[in-house]
């Protein structure tokens, strides 16, 4: 195989783009060169075994069900290679075919969203090695010294009229929050070269009093907080001045080390709100975990004046990863109807979702009702902290419930403040057992979906945006979610120049994601979420979408109970969208 992935073989073959497209009508993306095709492959799906053909490109693997030489478009299985977690070969050619049977030689694809696809090949005639080698090479480009598909794709794609990289501007967002006109808060550029904190954005906002203490004071703050992630502003109510700030854990250690600068800084945050009697600190971790972190040099705020501390009991990335695995085991490939609720309970997934929602609701109550400021952190401040600040801000500020505002929120609270997308997803890396991988962002989207269920009229977008965003999170077609920080993404890799933003696609396809029930006037208020466990649901449309026994399949020969109602609902929503578009044109 050369660098382009070209192969030759008796059964598997490298075919020209025009030949493949003519035979299967496969629409290729820019730079999506064809790598390999393999005939006489069988897919083992929830509905049975289906013979067909595999086509591998630089971006995806496509399986097409064949019937007498005819390919059915509705049975096209399309898997972006960025979603692949690992490929596992099954069976060996040295084993007797008669003993093994036709179903025991092939390979299994395990995806990062926990979907599993099993394929078998004919051991006598197939070229499984080239299939798996091609998949491994392009599913894990970083492990094979290849560029990410996002950069290859962008190099051959004309820039869209609406450039998603330009939607978020820290300066513009802070202006929206009234910071330039505030005497109490100041946007500072001490991190303009990312030398103060490599995982923080280029600019951030701190109390003016803290900045006037001088740069040595700010640097002292960085020395006392994990990864130099000092307490900074995320959001402020311009009327009450109640604010949400975020940071990482203080490095108190076993000895209980203190920092006069850090304590003064938190007092400055409290004093920036005249209504504030105390600064509530919400530590996302379970108390026992926070105490154990002291042995590693971390810790929590024990001796701060007027700064009560509450532990939210939200578990770490390892617990979350295991919990989602358990949930999906109960949903795919088949559901054990008798044991489903037991399996759901044992997964504890909804319990974890509830813990996060409860924490966000607590922050909203203190900021909106009590008019008090809050400070939120976990260990390093890039996982649970981002979940909590984002969900609280969505409830408090209707701007973040619009499509544009949601883009700004994700760019600010997740991308610019250093959520480690690269490590949590494992982009381009074949080390599937990496303990740093965890569905933290998926969990955030689940929490948001729960809120959208309670307030369907309050959001300009539907769950389709969340699902599309999660798919592209793995697919690596866009640069938005690549790498671990703003510094790496924008300064080192220059993704804003070398890749396309996912938000460009969203803005070009706004109609696809627009919520016809969105009420502009009614949606401007704070929404008060009920985090009760009995009101939470499993996000079937996302987690179980590959299970046709749960989600209605598209295959014409399978009649699923309720399928006609799903089609009617979609038709009605399309009609509502058309009427909404017509009404907007009339009022324009």
Swiss-Prot record:
Its EC number is 3.1.3.95. Residues 563-588 form a coiled coil. Its main location: membrane. InterPro entries: GRAM (IPR004182), Myotubularin (IPR030564), Myotubularin-like_Pase_dom (IPR010569), PH-like_dom_sf (IPR011993), Prot-tyrosine_phosphatase-like (IPR029021), Tyr_Pase_AS (IPR016130), Tyr_Pase_cat (IPR003595). It catalyses: a 1,2-diacyl-sn-glycero-3-phospho-(1D-myo-inositol-3,5-bisphosphate) + H2O = a 1,2-diacyl-sn-glycero-3-phospho-(1D-myo-inositol-5-phosphate) + phosphate; a 1,2-diacyl-sn-glycero-3-phospho-(1D-myo-inositol-3-phosphate) + H2O = a 1,2-diacyl-sn-glycero-3-phospho-(1D-myo-inositol) + phosphate; 1,2-dioctanoyl-sn-glycero-3-phospho-(1-D-myo-inositol-3-phosphate) + H2O = 1,2-dioctanoyl-sn-glycero-3-phospho-(1D-myo-inositol) + phosphate. It holds the Pfam family Myotub-related. Residues 164-543 form the Myotubularin phosphatase domain. This is Phosphatidylinositol-3,5-bisphosphate 3-phosphatase mtm-1.
């Amino acid at each position: 195989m050369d660098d382009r992935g070209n192969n030759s073989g008796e059964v598997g073959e490298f075919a020209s783009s025009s030949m493949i497209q003519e035979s299967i009508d496969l629409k290729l993306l820019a730079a999506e060169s064809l790598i390999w095709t393999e005939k006489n492959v069988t897919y083992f799906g929830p509905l049975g075994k289906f013979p067909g053909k595999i086509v591998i490109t630089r971006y995806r693997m496509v399986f097409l069900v064949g019937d007498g030489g005819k390919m059915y478009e509705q049975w096209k299985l399309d898997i972006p290679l960025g979603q692949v977690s690992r490929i596992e070969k099954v069976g060996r050619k040295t084993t007797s075919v008669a003993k093994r049977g036709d179903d025991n030689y092939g390979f299994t694809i395990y995806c990062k969203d926990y979907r599993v696809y099993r394929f078998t090949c004919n051991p006598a005639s197939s070229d499984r090695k080239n299939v798996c080698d091609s998949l491994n090479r392009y599913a894990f480009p970083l492990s094979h010294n290849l560029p990410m598909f996002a950069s290859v794709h962008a190099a051959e794609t004309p820039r869209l009229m609406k450039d998603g990289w330009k939607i978020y501007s820290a300066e513009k967002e802070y202006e929206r929050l009234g910071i330039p006109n505030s005497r109490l808060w100041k946007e500072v550029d001490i991190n303009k070269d990312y030398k103060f904190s490599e995982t923080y954005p280029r600019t951030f906002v701190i109390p003016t009093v803290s900045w006037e203490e001088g740069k040595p004071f700010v640097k002292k703050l960085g020395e006392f907080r994990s990864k130099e992630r000092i307490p900074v502003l995320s959001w402020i109510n311009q009327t009450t001045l109640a604010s949400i700030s975020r940071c990482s854990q203080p490095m108190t250690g076993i000895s209980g080390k203190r920092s006069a600068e850090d304590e003064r800084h938190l007092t400055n945050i409290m004093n920036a709100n005249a209504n504030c009697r105390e600064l509530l600190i919400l530590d996302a971790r379970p108390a026992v975990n926070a105490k154990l972190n002291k042995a590693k040099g971390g810790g929590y705020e024990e001796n701060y004046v007027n700064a009560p501390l509450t532990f939210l009991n939200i578990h770490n990335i390892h617990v979350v990863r295991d919990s989602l695995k358990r949930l999906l085991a109960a949903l795919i490939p088949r559901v054990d109807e008798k044991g489903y609720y037991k399996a759901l309970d044992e997964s504890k997934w909804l319990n974890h979702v509830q813990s996060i929602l409860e924490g966000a609701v607590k922050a909203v109550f203190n900021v909106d009702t009590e008019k008090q400021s809050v400070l939120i952190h976990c260990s390093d401040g890039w996982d649970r902290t981002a979940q909590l600040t984002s969900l609280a801000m969505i409830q408090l500020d209707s701007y973040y419930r619009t499509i544009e505002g949601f883009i700004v929120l994700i760019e600010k609270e997740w991308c610019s403040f250093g959520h480690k997308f690269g490590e949590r997803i494992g982009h381009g890396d074949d080390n599937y057992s990496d303990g740093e991988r965890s569905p933290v962002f998926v969990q955030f989207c689940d929490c948001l979906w729960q809120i959208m269920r309670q307030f369907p009229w309050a959001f300009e977008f539907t769950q389709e945006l969340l699902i599309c965003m999660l798919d592209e999170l793995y697919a690596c077609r866009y640069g938005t979610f690549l790498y671990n920080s703003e510094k790496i993404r924008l300064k080192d890799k220059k993704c804003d120049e070398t890749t396309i933003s996912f938000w460009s696609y969203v803005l070009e396809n706004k109609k696809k994601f627009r919520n016809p029930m969105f009420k502009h006037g009614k949606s401007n208020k704070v929404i008060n979420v009920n985090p009760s466990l009995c009101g939470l649901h499993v996000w079937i449309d996302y987690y179980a979408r590959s299970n046709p026994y749960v989600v209605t399949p598209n295959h014409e020969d399978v009649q699923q109970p309720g399928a006609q109602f799903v089609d009617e609902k979609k038709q009605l929503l399309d009609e509502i969208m058309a009427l909404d578009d017509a009404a907007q044109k009339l009022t324009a």
